[in-house]
Amino acid sequence: MQMNRLDQAFAALADPTRRGIVVHLARGEASVSDLVGLFSLTQPTISSHLKVLESSGLISRSRVAQSRPCKLETQQLKAVTDWLERVQELWEGNFKRLDALLAELKQAQKEERKK
């Protein structure tokens, strides 16, 4: 995934309403009117949030008669998750090295006290 796309996804997810929309869409498709009722926001406000989510690739909207159901795009969400997991692995590696260093220092202190 290009970094620009990742940046767009994180920017989209920075807003609590958009995160709420993503959580709701994880349960299944929803129309704009469904989301308006759920979040007690105006239709233009919800549409604005959906536009940001759609441009980031996190959701897609189709046209069914007069409705435009929204659905979560799991591929883009997986790319975000994969990036976070890589960062988590780096941090866990740092913590493991720190734990090993602390264990070494404790052992050295014990040996020093015995002298």
Predicted ranges, named:
Residues 1-5, 24-38, 43, 52-56, ...:
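C-terminal regulatory/oligomerization modules of transcriptional regulators
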Residues 12-17:
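Short helix-coil-helix linker/hinge
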Residues 19-21:
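Pre-recognition alpha-helix immediately N-terminal to the DNA-recognition helix
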Residues 47, 63-69:
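Short, Lys/Arg-rich nucleic-acid/phosphate-binding segment
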